[in-house]
Curated annotation (Swiss-Prot):
This is Lysine-specific demethylase phf2. The keyword Oxidoreductase applies. Pfam families: JHD, JmjC, PHD. Fe cation binds at residues 249, 251, 321. The gene is phf2. It comes from Danio rerio (Zebrafish). Residues 197-353 form the JmjC domain.
Length: 1063
């Protein structure tokens, strides 16, 4: 029977579970445990001799180390980079100098480190405590040492041991490591950093600091009966030998950490968690050779902090740190997550998830802890709001960050990855919704309290302070700059919670102009809060009244109708004061100075735009500078906030408040700004400009403001740069710039416009105000250009209408009356600005304005007359007339425009509103403006007409004359549309120009007429057109679709039967 081979001095058969080494002399195999050779040491042995062979061949020899790289096998001749943690690296690290930690580390006593201190000053910098007294921390006696750790924890407990030289880890029993620690001949540098003993007997003699127990999420908010176990990160024992080194790292979950040195000493290398440093850290950690690069060389500053025996160090969330142990050391530490640095914790957690690096001190179930904290935040906010108390700003900011993380974790594409850490019996969607609601309520209350503090500061100003008119323009222009809400902390790691509550008494000192530009970034919040108090205000009582009104709105959101009435009555009382005129004049002067100084240096807008902006400055100053610093806004299921009063039409609370936009560049929004799913209240710092404007409503108190200022009778307007409050620009503040002229105002004295007709042929005639035989008064506009008159006569002949005054004579008189009552604001786009070229030469023809009271009565009468005359006009039976409910964004003929979708120019819209407008003062002219639709249409018509007539009607002499006429008319029209200033020959009026450039708006009218285009031939009547057709082709049988003049013109000009001009 064959025998089993045996090996080693123990003469046992081969065991696959035991490490064995071969002797180079006798070629026999020996167990490592029998001959005293560890498995980790074997790669370093060059020639091994067993105990028997050592007597004859000598001792074993080790490989010569050519480099301190962990990948080096000793066989390659090249020199590799120094490995982090190697002996050469430790020697170099000890000799280097680093900036002192005095700049960043805060030194306190144990009794000073309280929850109130951290809430006021934040926890953004490391805190060093010299003695443990006052910390509420329990530590063993100074005689406690490593052997006692083994007795309390157990000798057979497996621990993770880090080989510092190679920066690798392996498992080892605690007894074996303690034997290594006490041995005099240490062949390696081993380090134990993750011995967690919260469940061991040693937990009874070691207690974390009291401040940690108060802040820790796991200690306070994790239920004891939860299925998912608590993360065991609160109590660690660190047993480190001399020259132990832990490379740069961020604690898992972005946790903060505390260290207490019981014996020995530790050196910390600290790096601030700025955005740049975090990006560098992520790039460094993800590189394959990061263990060969010292990360401190890549950042601006790395601080060195020495922690001696008996001292305690608290390191905040996100700080990148490395640890060197210069002497044998026994220390205790613990990790904790808290509400003071939620933003940084989330950022660090995201970095950790992207890197996917296994850590020896993981923070398991971090997301579960966040869910429990979110539930706590909801209960906390509800309780505080019921008690009419305000949660701390850092708590509100933390709740916003957590709720944003909840949303990303519960998205459909990310739910599978995160659902394992979702607590049982948790309804995430309901929690997100309820928490968002409480956050918004808290933010609104915070804004109200901030405005009340600003009011107190204004009242505390000395009575002999300078009036607002004498302050420099820079102080007034400051509120237009973006201002961050006081309750939101900075996205960067620089003390987000500091300097928020205090400093209101110092606000009166802020208006010193030389010191304002020198405010540093750290003091922005204080300075911006100060600037709110410098807004020109002569009567603090008005501001207090508005703020009390805003507070009532917050407390009684279930009574919107009552609040609207009280709000309006308060605002009316504020504005009906005798010295309002003087105040508005001063504000207007400030706006002018502010605009000039602002763009003089920035040079970001041309002068022409500045002049246009100045026309609306006065109206906006009534709200932005008088007494309204904050307002509340609702949008369609997206919650935003604004510095100005801004509401949408679907809001139930502020339905009567005008939506006013600021015309200034909008800064980038806060990266953690929260937008809710419900239409509820929130303050938005930087409102977003929207394309679609809601229907505007006027303030009742704005109309009251206008009345005391405007004179009762004013024969003509002054040609000054600054407009008086009764000009059309003031009144047209509430008219949308997107050609929507419907204005609604319950409390306004201006009557409601019921909309114009969808423009057809007669609307074009109304726009041009041209019918034969009309007498124009001195105040009216001059007649249309000859080319336009001919085109209109052609359209009349097509529609079988006579050139008479029956339809349009009353309209002209009505439109003149309407110009006195309704101000139709010209478009703010540059395309509509070309009409101002001729206006500067004849400012005396500007119509005088009537008072609002008389205009409301006249406009209603004139509107009824329009209805009667327009209904008597001709309607084409083949044309479908749309209703007045159609809007520009949803055109009725949208489904019919399927043939030509790739045209360069938009076809003429039947719903466009073209009407006469009062010229605005000093608007910039557009040089060389052209309209492609008119030019291409006329050119195509001329080319086709000439081509057909040359082939078919060569015998007729009249055909030879049509070609130059058509070409001349097309050139004339294109020249008229592009010329910035009207010439005496053309005598083109403003309405003609606005139609040709596509920016006109329609005046009154209820029935849409048949759409048409400019024609190049004048056809006086339908009878003459038929005679003309018969004379041209007397004997030939005409083709189908070319029998009548209307059909031929339609073919030539490519008029589709539904009325669109197809090019």
């Amino acid at each position: 029977m064959a025998t089993v081979p045996v090996y080693c001095i123990c003469r046992l058969p081969y065991d696959v579970t035991q490490f064995m080494i071969e002797c180079d002399a006798c070629k026999d195999w020996f167990h490592g445990s029998c001959v005293g050779v560890d498995e980790d040491e074997a790669p370093d042995i060059d020639i091994y001799h067993c105990p028997n062979c050592e007597k004859t061949h000598g001792k074993s020899t080790l490989k010569k180390k050519k480099s301190w790289n962990k990948h080096d096998t000793g066989q390659s001749g090249d020199v590799r980079p120094v490995q982090n943690g190697s002996q050469v690296f430790i020697k170099e690290l000890r000799s280097r100098t680093f900036p002192s930690s005095e700049d960043v580390v805060v030194k306190l006593s144990g009794s000073q480190l309280t929850l109130e201190y951290l809430e006021e000053n934040g926890f953004n910098e490391p805190i060093l405590i010299q003695k443990k007294d006052g910390l509420g921390m329990a530590m063993p006696a100074p005689t406690f040492y490593v052997s006692d750790v083994e007795n309390y924890v157990g000798p057979d407990v497996l621990v993770d041991v880090v080989d510092v030289t190679k920066q690798t880890d392996s498992k080892m029993k605690l007894k074996e490591f303690v034997d290594y620690y006490y041995s005099t001949n240490r062949k390696k540098v081993l380090n134990v950093i993750n011995l967690e003993f919260s469940d061991a007997r040693m937990a009874n003699i070691v207690e974390s600091p009291q401040i940690v127990r108060k802040l820790s999420w796991v200690e306070n908010y994790w239920p004891d009966d939860a299925l998912l176990g608590k993360p065991k990160v609160s109590k660690y024992c660190l047993i480190c030998v001399k020259d132990s080194y832990t490379d740069f790292h961020i604690e898992c979950g972005g946790a903060s950490v505390w260290y207490h040195v019981l014996k020995g000493e530790k050196i910390f290398f600290l790096i601030k968690p700025t955005s740049a440093n975090l990006s560098l850290y992520e790039r460094w950690r993800s590189s394959s050779n990061h263990s060969e690069m010292f990360f401190a060389d890549q950042v601006d500053k790395c601080y060195k902090c020495t922690l001696k025996q008996g001292q305690t160090l608290f390191i905040p969330s996100g700080w990148i740190n490395a640890i060197l142990t210069p002497v044998d050391c026994l220390a205790f530490s613990g990790h904790f997550v808290h509400s003071l640095s939620v933003e940084m914790q989330m950022r660090a957690y995201e970095v950790e998830k992207r890197l996917k690096v296994a850590s020896l001190t993981p923070f398991s179930n971090f997301e579960t802890a966040c869910w429990y904290v979110g539930k706590y935040y909801l209960e906390q906010f509800k309780g505080l709001h019921k008690a009419n108390k305000q949660p701390p700003p850092y708590l509100v900011h933390g709740a916003k960050i957590v709720n944003g993380a909840f949303r990303s974790w519960t998205k459909k594409q990310a739910l599978l990855e995160h659902e394992d850490e979702l607590p049982e019996n948790m309804k995430p969607a309901q929690l997100i919704k309820d928490l968002a609601k409480e956050i918004r309520i808290a933010e609104v209350k915070q804004v109200v309290s901030d405005s009340q503090n600003a009011t107190k500061a204004i009242k505390s100003e000395p009575s002999n302070s300078k009036p607002p008119a004498e302050e420099p323009p820079s102080a007034l222009s400051e509120p237009e700059e973006p201002m961050s809400p006081a309750h939101v902390s900075s996205p960067s790691g620089d003390k987000p919670a500091r300097k928020k509550v205090p400093k209101p008494p110092k606000m009166p000192k802020a208006p010193k102009p030389p010191k304002e530009p020198k405010i540093k970034e750290g003091g922005k919040k204080k300075a911006k809060k100060v600037k709110e108090g410098v807004i020109p205000e002569k009567k603090p009582s008005s501001l207090a009244a508005l703020e009390s009104h805003a507070k009532d709105i917050l407390n009684k959101m279930d009574q919107p109708k009552k609040l609207i009435k009280t709000g309006m009555s308060i605002m009316e009382k504020e504005t009906n004061k005798p010295n309002d005129v003087k105040k508005f004049e001063m504000i207007r002067e400030h706006n002018k100075n502010k605009t000039e100084s602002k763009w003089k240096y920035k040079n970001s807008k041309p002068d022409s735009l500045l002049k246009m902006e100045e026309e609306h400055k006065f109206d906006k100053s009534l709200l932005s500078h008088k007494d309204n610093k904050f307002a509340f806004s609702l949008s369609n299921k997206k919650l935003l906030g604004s510095k100005m009063l801004k509401t949408q039409t679907n809001s139930s609370v502020f339905g009567s408040i005008q939506n006013i936009k600021e015309e200034k560049p909008k800064p980038v929004r806060d990266e953690y700004e929260y937008v809710s799913d419900e239409g509820e209240l929130k303050i938005e710092e930087f409102p977003i400009r929207r394309k679609k404007n809601a229907v505007k409503r006027e303030f009742s108190f704005l109309s009251n403001i206008k009345e005391p200022i405007q004179p009762s009778k004013k024969p003509k307007l002054p040609p000054s740069d600054m407009k008086s409050p009764d000009t059309s620009d003031e009144e047209s503040l509430h008219i949308d710039t997107e050609a929507k002229t419907d204005v609604k105002g319950r409390n306004s004295k201006v009557s409601k416009k019921k909309g114009g007709s969808s423009a057809g042929i007669l609307d074009l005639l109304q726009a041009s105000k041209q019918v034969g035989g009309i007498d124009y008064s001195n105040n009216s506009q001059p007649p249309a250009s000859p080319s336009t008159q001919e085109a209109i006569q052609g359209m009349l002949s097509m529609a079988n209408l006579q050139s008479s005054d029956s339809c349009l004579q009353p309209f002209w008189s009505n439109s003149q009356a309407k110009n006195n009552s309704h101000s139709s604001a010209a478009s703010k786009k540059p395309s509509g600005a070309a009409g101002a070229g001729g206006n500067s030469k004849r400012p005396a023809k500007r119509l005088p304005k009537k008072t609002q009271k008389s205009s409301s009565v006249d406009s209603s009468d004139m509107f009824d007359d329009d209805q009667d005359h327009l209904e008597a006009c001709f309607k084409d039976s083949d044309y479908v007339y749309p209703s007045l409910e159609s809007e520009e964004d949803n055109p009725i003929f949208k489904s019919r425009s399927k043939k030509r979708k790739n045209t360069d120019d938009t076809p003429y819209s039947p719903t466009a509103r073209v009407g006469p407008t009062v010229p605005r003062q000093e608007r910039p002219a557009r040089e060389g403006a052209r309209v492609a639709s008119i030019e291409t249409g006329l050119a195509a018509a001329a080319a086709k007409l000439s081509h057909q007539e040359e082939q078919k009607i060569k015998k007729k002499k009249k055909s030879a004359k049509k070609k130059p006429i058509v070409a001349e008319e097309s050139h004339k029209l294109s020249h008229d549309s592009s010329s910035p200033e009207p010439t005496p020959d053309s005598e083109s009026n403003m309405a003609d120009h606005e139609y040709s450039t596509g920016t006109g708006k329609s005046a009154g009218g209820s029935q849409p007429m048949a759409p048409g285009v400019f024609l190049s031939h004048r056809r006086p009547s339908s009878s003459s057109s038929s005679q003309n057709a018969s004379s041209v082709l007397p004997a030939k049988r005409l083709k189908k679709g070319m029998a009548t003049a209307k059909q031929r013109l339609g073919k030539i000009l490519k008029i589709h039967r539904n009325g669109k001009l197809l090019l």
